[in-house]
Design a protein with these regions (language model features):
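Nucleotide-activated chemistry modules centered on ATP-dependent adenylation/adenylyltransferase
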Residues: 1-271
Length: 271
């Protein structure tokens, strides 16, 4: 079994070092964020989950310029939609710029247009809804963590740059002194530049940080017993999670059945 240390993930005894490193990382790349997007500074993606709440708190503590954005996927749990609205109202009162971006098409409309549902290997919904970036050359920051899955352990690091919109020639760096200079030098020419301050946090570190900072979290975790905050019936969720969501939100199940019937009918009409 690969240990957290081998994966470069902080264990629960590393909380102080983890938060200090995260804030240092945010401060280090603020000049880059301001040069690429002077109006907004960093653009911080907010989903309404625990990781996102930790991320915004770290940005507030760092004292840098940033804008928080939330992409309305049209498939979020209603409680999450209300929670995001509440947090944005609170942060806006503190002078933090917050933006909710609504898509041109809903999830249902996109599926009808494509005549298919998303699945694990073709998650077009993420590309068009969840991962939409309104400011192409900004420095983005997300609350992704390597400990969330084996896939993220292999892909996600503190600094990510990609040379083209199609994400070719991916450059991934850990936040250390040798990588810091290279990342700063490269970022001015790369279209895609992301800072992930909590990429190396374990779930234990995240939960200890929430307790230490007394952070408010989305009520869905306690109310529904969920482990994740995301779209209802997401193909990346486990079968167990999707079955539980189907029981909790039967109205969405009916809509999915309607969608499947409509897609099947439109395909038959084309044939």
């Amino acid at each position: 079994m690969i240990t957290y240390e081998q994966q470069g993930i902080f264990g629960e005894t590393d909380l102080e070092f983890a938060e200090r490193t995260a804030i240092e990382l945010i401060k280090t790349f603020e000049p880059v964020a301001l040069q690429r997007c002077p109006e907004h500074g960093y653009v911080v993606g907010y989903s309404g989950g625990k990781d996102s709440d930790c991320l915004v708190d770290l940005f507030i503590r760092s004292g840098v310029k940033f804008t928080v954005i939330h992409n309305h996927t049209t498939l979020d749990i209603p409680d999450t939609v209300r929670y995001v609205r509440k947090r944005f109202t609170e942060w806006a009162a503190q002078g933090i710029q917050c933006e909710v971006h609504k898509p041109k098409e809903s999830f249902w409309q996109i599926c009808i247009r494509k005549k298919m549902l998303p699945f694990r290997t073709r998650r077009f919904c993420c590309e068009e809804l969840k991962e939409y970036q309104p400011y192409p050359f900004a420095v983005y920051s997300f609350g992704v963590r390597r400990a969330e899955s084996n896939g993220r352990a292999q892909r996600r690091n503190n600094i990510e740059t990609r040379n083209t919109k199609k994400y070719n020639d991916v450059q991934l760096f850990h936040f250390d002194k040798s990588a810091e200079v290279r990342s700063t030098d490269m970022c001015y020419t790369n279209r895609y530049f992301v800072v992930n301050p909590i990429a190396q946090w374990s779930t234990a570190v995240r939960d200890k940080y929430i307790a230490k900072r007394n952070l408010e979290v989305n009520p869905i975790y306690e109310k529904y017993g969920l482990d994740r905050c995301g779209c209802i019936m997401c193909p990346m969720a486990s079968d167990k999670e999707r079955r539980r969501e189907a029981e909790m939100f039967p109205g969405y199940v009916k809509t999915f059945r309607w969608l499947c019937d409509k897609i099947a009918k439109e395909r038959d009409d084309v044939e």
